[in-house]
Structures are given as structure tokens and as C-alpha cells.
């Protein structure tokens, strides 16, 4: 009889937690406009694909002449999402600082790139360290659900 109760409790918990795990997950790649997808590869190749923190003249010229749309595209889709590309905050900061456009490209993935900052230079690394990256904390949600399931299942087994 106790074994039947344990099975029933485990099945109940599995059915109760399953809808939480079935929520659609966000995509790894951010949404990108067609303009962003066609314009950015050239700039990315000139500036960030070399692996060097010393930018070329062509790179600096392109960074200085970039429109606000291009800045927003670079910030939101590449700098703020290192999972998509290898452009990390410190690497981006090194290149944009040497080109003299750090204030223009100091962004955090919130479509605010290209806005001039008021009052002095920024010491930001180009990322918001308080945010989770990639999946918006979905992995933590799954881990918490599984931990709760394990806790409840062990309590049920101890009781019966």
C-alpha cells in the first residue's frame, strides 16, 4: 500500500512540475533586422575578427562614421551577447578606446548605444553584470524546479 502511495505522489509531482518545464525558451540569437545583418559583417571583420586589440585605420574610420542604427545593432546583437560572438566587454572596450569612440559604444544591450554620455568618462566594461546572459535565467528556473521536485519526493518517501 505504501508503495502505491509513493508512486502516486511521484506521478502527481511530475505532472505538477511538467508545465513549468514546457514553457518555450528564448532563442540564443537575438532578433536582427535585415539592415543590421547586411551592414555589420564588414565592420565586424575589420575590427573584431582580427583577434588583436590594436585596431586598423579602416576599423577606426568605420567605427567613427557608424550611424546610430549600426551602433545599436553592434551593441544589442554582438557586444551585449558574447554567446553569439567572441566580442566580450573588455575586448570591445580596448578597441573602441584606442579608436577614441568608447563613449559612443559603451552599451549594455538595451538599445541605448550611440547616445552621448553626460559628465566624464565611463568606467563601465560595456556589460551590465547584474543581468543573466543568454537564456534570461531559464537554466536557474529549471534547476530550482528540479530541486523542489527532489525535496518534495524525498519528503514523501520519508513519510510513507
Curated annotation (Swiss-Prot):
Protein location: Cell membrane
Q: Where is this region: Disordered?
A: 111-136
Concerning Pfam families, the annotation shows: LTP_2 (PF14368)
Gene Ontology CC: plasma membrane; side of membrane
**InterPro entries xref list:** Bifun_inhib/LTP/seed_sf (IPR036312), Bifunc_inhib/LTP/seed_store (IPR016140)
Lipid anchor positions (GPI-anchor amidated asparagine):
135
Query: Where does the UniProt annotation place the signal sequence?
Result: 1-22
Cystine bridges: which residues? 36-75, 47-59, 60-99, 73-107
Main localisation, per the record? membrane
Proregion residues excised on maturation: 136-160
Is Iron found in the keyword set?
no
CDD domains from the entry? AAI_LTSS
Could you tell me which SUPFAM superfamilies the record lists for this protein?
Bifunctional inhibitor/lipid-transfer protein/seed storage 2S albumin
Sorted alphabetically, the keyword list is: Cell membrane, Disulfide bond, Glycoprotein, GPI-anchor, Lipoprotein, Membrane, Signal
| Membrane topology according to the record | Lipid-anchor; GPI-anchor
Where do glycans attach?
86
Q: Which family does it belong to?
A: Belongs to the plant LTP family.
Question: What's this protein's function?
Answer: Probable lipid transfer protein.
Q: What is this protein called?
A: Non-specific lipid transfer protein GPI-anchored 28
Traced from the root, the source organism's taxonomic lineage reads: Eukaryota, Viridiplantae, Streptophyta, Embryophyta, Tracheophyta
Report which gene this protein is encoded by: LTPG28
Amino acid at each position: 500500500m505504501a508503495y502505491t502511495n509513493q508512486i502516486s505522489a511521484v506521478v502527481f509531482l511530475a505532472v505538477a512540475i511538467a508545465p513549468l518545464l514546457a514553457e518555450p525558451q528564448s532563442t540564443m540569437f537575438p532578433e536582427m533586422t535585415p539592415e543590421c545583418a547586411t551592414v555589420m559583417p564588414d565592420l565586424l571583420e575589420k575590427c573584431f575578427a582580427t583577434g588583436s586589440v590594436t585596431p586598423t585605420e579602416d576599423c577606426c574610420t568605420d567605427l567613427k562614421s557608424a550611424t546610430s542604427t549600426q551602433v545599436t545593432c553592434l551593441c544589442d546583437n554582438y557586444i551585449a551577447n558574447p554567446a553569439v560572438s567572441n566580442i566580450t566587454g573588455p575586448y570591445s572596450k580596448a578597441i573602441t578606446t584606442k579608436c577614441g569612440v568608447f563613449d559612443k559604444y559603451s552599451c549594455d544591450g538595451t538599445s541605448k548605444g550611440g547616445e552621448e554620455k553626460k559628465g566624464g568618462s565611463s568606467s563601465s566594461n560595456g556589460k551590465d553584470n547584474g543581468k543573466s546572459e543568454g537564456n534570461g535565467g531559464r537554466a536557474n528556473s529549471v534547476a530550482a524546479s528540479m530541486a523542489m521536485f527532489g525535496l518534495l519526493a524525498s519528503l514523501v518517501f520519508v513519510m510513507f
